[in-house]
């Protein structure tokens, strides 16, 4: 059958009817199958205004079905070569079909809730009472002069998955972005995180050094803030990055993706897990993606190969456990030893063979669609070596030599030479996807899904790159990490026809993730000098299991009022078989504590949708969340199963008691000895400085002996904290000192902290809960334009990562509160198809958002989890698209207006750590008090989550030869970024990007292009070029200074049979 409409047409869907199913519908409708449409139907259908341009008859009928809100089944082959003059004016549905088909041999016949296209026949009606404008009475006998043979058909009108996803961006009263199956497969790139490129306002943290996605939406990122679900299942693991913070990893195989929707901000959307930042909703392949229209069985084979790859030169880990003296001598540099099997010169651009065969992928899918059931089986594999970086635009990253700066970025290109291999970037991914759908009745659906993915990939702890030696030894190549993830889900839908009370959905699911990753903090090979044994202190093992239930029901209370009820339950368990302290205290300090704990979360929500008139709608609802969590590792530690001397920080809580500050004054009187010595020193100073006025308080500090004798009375100021270790600006002791009028000097100028170590006596269960409302309204200003506004609150309850002791942060004294987000958004949407007579899509959307999150969970400057007062984010987003079949484009721009973090306690601590300075007004802090700072405070996580101030994504293309050939190009721009901590030369920040200071990047343009050709109904070939300008760059939000892939060419072949 001819493929109809390869472009993305608005409001069009393709789903299949088997011949048997269609025949059953036809028989059930009796004589309606062969009779022309009559006015009786027109009386029940609304009249609408249409302006459909001339074109191929199949396309015109499709557009009419879309705009009228119905569906029509047709055999596209029967319409080949037929054209239509279009439709303009006011018509009911039946009148419109009659007008479009009046000069053809076809008519449209109503079948159930839709229509089917049938050849016209001349019925003989044996009754003198039948009128031309009415249906025949039941006594009439109808005979056909000719019968119509039913052929495989395609039903148009109802949207398919991808069309619905793209349209929802402009139809929903909220912000989102969508990528369909073709787009994901075309631009899936080198790393899994590449599937998010091109989505406005959406990024992934540490894209090149994680093998996973760490979603960021409108600057909101982190564990639990932007949940990622795959077919309704959730899997997320927090991973330590040493001095460079934490990753929120979501492992996914791009070869299984059928569509990605990113929802921006909290939402009460049905059967969707969102949080304070929104959600990433991933759907995997279905039988509809594989079985050809009108067929019952189908298979798809996809193979592809890419350039710019080379097999990694992996170290031999069999030496672990051997005596160092029995191995190849290690490299001795600057008093340290380096394993030559790990530290080796990286391959150069001359080793980059364009057709090496080191990046190959394939996918085989087999499916069947029957009346009662569907089955799908998919196997996908991709093996890719290390990639090579680009060569152009490296000047920004080559502004200093390694021995002249502790700032990584200015000499980044010395470590990663442009065009050279980037170690630790390889991947071997293998997946299975099995789905079975059973339809016991027309009202019920039961779907069972199983997904299994093995991912063996390269990564390195960012702080182990050892920047000072990489130009000489090369970037170390570590062994590969290993992830095995499984997911199971059972979905049930029940939607009785003509029942306004029941539209029920339930999903029971589980994910299991086994991790063996090089994220523990040590080294893959190091020497245990107690016995000279080579040991591996970098590998970490963990198991994460999540079990969940999601249920919802939608009820139509009135014709204008819907109520949706929903609820969910999540149970999570994290375990590890790592033995903390197995190599003694000298190594345990470099290793992460093995987190272990349990957590449960429950939600309940309701949402009303009210449509009082056709141009106005309202949404109002609330969500309740509750949780509890318990730290199993801490509990085990407190039972004396782990020696606390290895790391006492996890058995004690730190609480700031006070800051003390010393200053000196003149004593009320000097001792006789002091007075004699001062007199002698005064005389000497006066002799050398005849202009001296003789006053002791004007003796400069350079006369240190006399100066110290004069100011010999030591005094102490104290800035006391409250019972929870929090400081108040009103208690600033310098204000009191300056107001006293007392003469004093300061020789040190630094405040000293006094911290109480409070023993942890028990690992108690922590819990919390909260209700959050959401409101929205939309107004259609014209039939083609509307405005909307929404207000959404949301709670994010502390994650298991924030509820357990382990890597990256110490135990907090005060219990962590839930984050509470307040999100505001207004938007304007305009459908411009009236401007373009041949447009399938022509939309523009402008949105403004302002998000404030109170009690945002963060790591403070003392590396302790705490609640910041608030974070404020705001920005503008523009999205647009156009498609007329021959030409299409999709353009989007994001401009961030504000990213501000506010916290009184952090601001005071930052001010104190900056030191003091003497001024004419007295003693003052060198840095002024600043409650709100851009991006975040030093040593925290938020400061590394800043996104580009300005970004642009553009896609444009054209179709030729009856849309068999498609050519397209994509451009992506990120504005340069440098953290305010760097720009302001913050004295409290350690040089060299220590303790989570974000990396900078230059203005970045990335250009991609593709050519897709449909050889015949069964075969498609596609060429894709990524980073065509061969740019040398790093990705935004990266925590690991690793160059991105250079120019890469991919060819793929897909066949369906």
Curated annotation (Swiss-Prot):
A GO MF label: siderophore uptake transmembrane transporter activity
Location of the protein in the cell: Cell outer membrane
Membrane association type: Multi-pass membrane protein
Phenotype of gene-disrupted mutants: In a mouse pulmonary infection model, the mutant exhibits reduced bacterial lung burden, and is virtually undetectable in the spleen and blood. In a systemic challenge, the mutant is avirulent.
Entry function: Part of a high affinity heme acquisition system. Functions as a gateway for heme entry into the bacterial cell, enabling growth on hemoprotein sources. Can acquire heme directly from hemoprotein reservoirs, however, HphA likely enhances the efficiency of this process by delivering heme to HphR. Is essential for virulence, bacterial dissemination and growth in the blood.
Name this protein carries in UniProt: Hemophilin receptor
Residue ranges annotated for the TBDR beta-barrel domain, each copy included: 296-1057
This protein's UniProt keywords: Cell outer membrane, Ion transport, Iron, Iron transport, Membrane, Receptor, TonB box, Transmembrane, Transmembrane beta strand, Transport, Virulence
Pfam families reported for this sequence: Plug (PF07715), STN (PF07660), TonB_dep_Rec_b-barrel (PF00593)
One GO CC term, this protein: cell outer membrane
Induction section of the entry: Part of the hemO gene cluster.
Location of the TBDR plug domain: 168-285
InterPro entries: Plug_dom, Plug_dom_sf, Secretin/TonB_short_N, TonB-dep_rcpt-like, TonB-dep_rcpt_b-brl, TonB_rcpt_b-brl_sf
Family assignment from sequence similarity: Belongs to the TonB-dependent receptor family.
């Amino acid at each position: 059958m001819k493929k109809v409409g390869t472009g993305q047409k608005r409001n069009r869907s393709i789903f299949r009817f088997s011949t048997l199913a269609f025949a059953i519908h036809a028989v059930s409708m009796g004589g309606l199958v062969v009779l022309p449409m009559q006015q009786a139907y027109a009386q029940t259908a609304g009249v609408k205004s249409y302006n459909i341009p001339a074109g191929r008859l199949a396309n015109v009928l499709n557009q009419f079905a879309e705009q009228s809100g119905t569906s029509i089944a047709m055999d596209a082959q029967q319409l080949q070569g037929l054209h239509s003059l279009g439709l303009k004016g006011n018509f009911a549905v039946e009148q419109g079909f009659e007008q479009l088909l009046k000069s053809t041999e076809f008519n449209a016949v109503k079948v159930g809730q839709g229509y089917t296209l049938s050849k016209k026949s001349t019925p003989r009606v044996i009754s003198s009472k039948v009128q031309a404008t009415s249906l025949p009475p039941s006594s009439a006998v109808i005979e056909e002069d000719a019968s119509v043979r039913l052929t495989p058909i395609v039903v148009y009108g109802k949207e398919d998955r991808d069309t619905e996803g793209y349209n929802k961006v402009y139809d929903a009263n909220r912000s989102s972005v969508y990528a369909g199956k073709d787009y994901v497969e075309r631009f899936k790139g080198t790393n899994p995180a590449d599937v998010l490129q091109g989505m406005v306002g959406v990024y992934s943290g540490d894209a090149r050094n994680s093998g996973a996605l760490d979603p960021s939406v409108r600057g909101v990122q982190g564990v639990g803030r932007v949940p990622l679900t795959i077919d309704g299942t959730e899997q997320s693991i927090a991973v330590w990055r040493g001095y460079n913070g934490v990753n929120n990893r979501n492992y996914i195989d791009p070869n299984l993706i059928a569509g990605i929707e990113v929802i921006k901000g909290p939402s009460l959307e049905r059967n969707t897990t969102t949080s304070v930042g929104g959600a990433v909703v991933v759907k995997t392949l279905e039988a509809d993606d594989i079985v050809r229209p009108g067929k019952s069985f189908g298979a798809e084979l996809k193979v592809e190969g890419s350039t710019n790859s080379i097999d990694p030169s992996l170290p031999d880990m069999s030496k672990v456990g051997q005596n160092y003296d029995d191995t190849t001598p290690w490299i001795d540099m600057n008093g340290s030893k380096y394993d030559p099997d790990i530290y080796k010169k990286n391959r150069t651009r001359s080793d980059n063979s364009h057709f090496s065969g080191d990046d190959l992928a394939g996918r085989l899918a087999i499916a069947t669609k029957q009346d009662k059931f569907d089955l799908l089986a998919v196997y996908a594999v991709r093996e890719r070596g290390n990639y090579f970086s680009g060569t152009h635009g490296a000047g920004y990253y080559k502004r200093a030599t390694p021995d002249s700066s502790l700032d990584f970025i200015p000499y980044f290109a010395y470590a990663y030479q442009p065009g050279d291999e980037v170690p630790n970037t390889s991947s071997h991914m293998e997946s299975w996807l099995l789905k079975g759908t059973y339809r016991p009745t027309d009202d019920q659906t039961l779907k069972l899904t199983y997904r299994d993915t093995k991912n063996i990939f390269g990564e390195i702890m960012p702080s182990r790159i050892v920047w000072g030696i990489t130009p000489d030894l090369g970037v170390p190549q570590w062994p590969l990490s290993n992830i095995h993830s499984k997911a199971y889900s059972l979905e049930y839908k029940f939607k009785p026809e003509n029942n306004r009370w029941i539209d029920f959905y339930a999903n029971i699911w589980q994910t299991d993730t086994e991790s063996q990753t090089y994220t523990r903090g040590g080294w893959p090979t190091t020497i245990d000098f107690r016995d000279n044994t080579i040991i591996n202190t970098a590998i970490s093992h963990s198991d994460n299991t999540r079990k969940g239930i999601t249920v919802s029901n939608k009820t139509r209370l009135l014709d204008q009022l819907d109520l949706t009820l929903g609820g969910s339950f999540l149970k999570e368990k994290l375990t590890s078989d790592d033995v903390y302290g197995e190599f003694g205290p000298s190594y345990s300090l470099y290793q992460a504590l093995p987190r272990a704990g349990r957590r449960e979360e429950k939600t309940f929500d309701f949402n009303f949708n009210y449509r009082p008139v056709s141009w106005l709608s309202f949404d109002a609802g609330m969500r309740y969340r509750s949780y509890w969590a318990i730290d199993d590792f801490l509990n085990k530690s407190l039972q004396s199963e782990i020696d606390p001397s290895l790391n006492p920080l996890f058995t004690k809580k730190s609480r700031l008691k006070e800051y003390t500050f010393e200053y000196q004054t003149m004593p009320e009187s000097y001792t006789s000895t002091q007075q004699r010595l001062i007199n002698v020193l005064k005389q000497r100073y006066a002799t050398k400085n005849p202009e001296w006025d003789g006053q002791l308080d004007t003796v400069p500090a350079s006369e240190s002996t006399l100066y110290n004798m004069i100011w010999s009375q030591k005094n102490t100021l104290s800035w006391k904290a409250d019972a929870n270790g929090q400081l108040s600006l009103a208690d600033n002791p310098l204000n009191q000192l300056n107001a006293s009028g007392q003469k004093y000097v300061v020789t040190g100028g630094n405040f000293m902290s006094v911290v109480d170590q409070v023993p942890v006596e028990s690992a108690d269960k922590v819990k919390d809960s909260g209700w959050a409302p959401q409101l929205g309204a939309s107004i259609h200003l014209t039939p083609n334009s509307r405005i909307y506004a929404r207000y959404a609150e949301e709670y994010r309850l502390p994650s298991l990562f924030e509820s357990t002791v382990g890597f990256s942060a110490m135990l907090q004294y005060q219990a962590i509160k839930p984050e509470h987000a307040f999100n505001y958004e207004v938007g304007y949407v305009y459908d411009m198809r009236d401007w373009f007579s041949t447009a399938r899509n022509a939309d523009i959307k402008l949105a403004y958002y302002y998000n404030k999150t109170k009690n945002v969970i963060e790591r403070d400057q003392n590396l302790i989890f705490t609640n910041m007062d608030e974070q404020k984010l705001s920005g503008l987003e523009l999205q647009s698209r156009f498609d007329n079949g021959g030409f299409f484009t999709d353009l989007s721009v994001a401009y961030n207006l504000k990213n501000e973090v506010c916290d009184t306690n952090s601001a005071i601590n930052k001010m104190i750590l900056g030191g003091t300075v003497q001024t004419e007004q007295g003693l003052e802090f060198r840095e002024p008090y600043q409650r709100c700072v851009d991006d975040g405070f030093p040593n925290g996580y938020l400061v590394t989550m800043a996104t580009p101030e300005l970004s642009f994504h553009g896609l444009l293309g054209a179709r030729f030869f009856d849309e068999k050939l498609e050519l397209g190009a994509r451009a992506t721009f990120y504005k340069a970024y440098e953290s305010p901590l760097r720009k302001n030369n913050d004295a409290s920040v350690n040089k060299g990007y220590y303790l989570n200071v974000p990396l900078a990047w230059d203005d970045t343009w990335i250009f991609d292009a593709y050519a897709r050709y449909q050889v015949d109904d069964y075969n498609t070939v596609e060429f894709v070029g990524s980073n065509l300008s061969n740019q040398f760059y790093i990705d935004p939000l990266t925590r690991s200074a690793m160059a991105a892939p250079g120019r890469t060419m991919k060819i793929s072949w897909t066949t369906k049979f």
